[in-house]
């Protein structure tokens, strides 16, 4: 990790205000998962093409998230069953910038991710009436949800020096609920965020050279499955086997 931090700190910085130009609240996402041992080589090759978000001189930022779902885990099952127009609801604390939001993500029938959010004072395990009203406004109807699990990680956010592209890398991921806990600390989850899908991305080109290939993966769904092995999971089995192989190799 010391080597990784040293390489990341060599990247040219970009501020939050500058990054607003590539906020991409409606976007195409492409995810990747790979062993953390590949990170130094990957970062060195990315260096000429990307800047890194810097807040108060820090380029690695902690995120805390509390995910909500229905009692029957509708959001998890919608994802598992490949239903379009599906949602995720969470509180997320951006620790470094001291900001917390209630966030709602929609994956629409065109494969685009649309994120709506409203600022809140802190993460709450119980939704306030104001929270519920906001969720109804965004989703379009009332829905009863409850806190399910925490997912915490450190994130590095890259912004391409020329293209309208952002890239996040999540490190040291941990998850827990009231009964169990686990982690994916040996794995990096990267996500390319683009206005329009383009395989010409410098990250995608470099990743392919290092045999890092795209994978559809959800931190919420994988942690749900790990914490609740009895949930429906047949369509996620290949992904779980892939992640287990990354961890064990």
Regions found by a protein language model. Give the residues of each.
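Phosphate-end processing signature that detects enzymes handling 5′-triphosphorylated RNA
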Residues: 1-249
């Amino acid at each position: 990790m010391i080597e990784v931090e040293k390489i990341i700190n060599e990247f040219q910085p970009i501020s939050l205000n500058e990054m607003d130009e590539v906020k991409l609240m409606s976007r195409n996402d492409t995810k990747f998962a790979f062993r953390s041992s590949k990170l130094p080589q990957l970062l060195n090759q990315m260096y000429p093409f990307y800047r890194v978000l810097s807040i108060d001189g820090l380029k690695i930022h902690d995120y805390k998230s509390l995910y909500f779902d229905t009692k029957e885990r509708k959001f998890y099952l919608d994802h598992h069953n490949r239903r379009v127009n599906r949602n995720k609801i969470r509180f997320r604390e951006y620790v470094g910038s001291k900001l917390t939001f209630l966030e709602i993500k929609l994956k629409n029938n065109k494969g685009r991710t649309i994120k709506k959010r409203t600022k809140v004072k802190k993460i709450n395990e119980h939704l306030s009436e104001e929270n519920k009203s906001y969720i109804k406004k965004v989703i379009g109807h009332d829905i009863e949800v409850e806190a399910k699990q925490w997912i915490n990680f450190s994130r590095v956010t890259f912004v391409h020096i020329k293209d309208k592209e952002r890239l996040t890398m999540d490190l040291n991921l941990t998850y827990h609920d009231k009964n169990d806990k686990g982690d994916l600390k040996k794995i990096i989850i990267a996500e390319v965020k683009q206005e329009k899908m383009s395989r010409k991305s410098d990250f995608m080109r470099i990743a392919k050279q290092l045999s890092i290939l795209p994978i559809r993966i959800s931190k919420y769904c994988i942690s749900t499955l790990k914490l609740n092995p009895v949930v429906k999971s047949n369509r996620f089995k290949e992904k779980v086997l892939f992640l287990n192989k990354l961890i064990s190799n």
